[in-house]
Amino acid sequence: MNKEAAYWITLAHIPGWGYAKINTLIVRFSQEQNISIGEFFDLPETEWQRLYALEPKDIEELNAAKADLPNNAFLAEQLENEGYELIPVTSPEYSQTLKANLKTNHAPALLYVKGNKQILQEKSVAIVGSRNASEVSLEFTDHIAQKATKDFKVVVSGFAKGVDKQALDAAIKYTGQSIIVLPQGIMTFSTGFKTYYKQIVDGDVLIVSVFHPRAPWKAELAMARNPIIYALADEIYVAESSETGGTWSGVIDGLRKKRKIYVRKPEPTEENANDLLIEKGAVAVDIQGNEILDESALLVKEQDAEFEKKILELLKSGEYTTKDILKRLDMNWSESRLRDFLKAQKGIETIIKKPLRYTGKQQTLFD
């Protein structure tokens, strides 16, 4: 990796090239052509054009980036000397959760890290929320971090004040593991490295950045960092959100991608957008992180349980098609849902006739 580091830095930060364009190229040379990134950069322009169908503008931008290789080689050496590591998207050390959630179009081509890289492979929980969070939101954050630690899950946060900082501090307090996702280049985080030196050395904190190592903090980098926090996590908990900002946009984007996101149910007197996010499809949870079912959902759950009992009782008396069952029990289920339920029951036998029929299995001595 050390020999290739300069090439990865060069490719990952070509001005104007987004993740989709970079990753598509990486797939083509590393998987389809089965060559290294160094071999790719050594190809003549004619081969770039022939093998990868690159436009003249792309080739011009690649050549401009290639001219910066000596500077990036020096930067790569400096990173190594200072204990930083690079994880390209092709590496088995790259977070599989991040890759699965962001895919080709949005996964960063290169991660800069410092700390225990194994943390990237563990089950993880992101706790997100407002910089100016209320006391109850911070208490919620503490509970979720404690629960995650107890379940041996890594806590992912973004190192902003408020919920982010509370999540990190709580994970440390409960002797858990954390990932800090930076809104800046990893070489500009010197104060943070001093603060969390012990936890980093002990293997409990991993620092991650996707930006150029020397990039200073910027508001736009903080916004670009937020999707990385969400994507590094298997579970997402929202302590508090307004109707604008990074937390709101991150949750909306996650819901659009069909991710299950847990949002703290606010008290009636609170002024935040948590209820709006729940209305949009997020799962309401209490201050301990337990799911809250509203009265209508509880009623449906009870009704379904009653139907299930009646189905099993009916099938003890003979063979029935799904239509027969629905009609006799006056159920509002679809046939496909009923079939799925019947297939999942060990005590139900399927009779292979047209149409299929179902009946209760005769018990044996060892049932």
Predicted regions and their residues:
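Glycine-biased, small-residue-rich flexible motifs in mid-sequence functional cores and linkers
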Residues: 1-5, 89-367
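Short, positively charged patches
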Residues: 1-139, 146
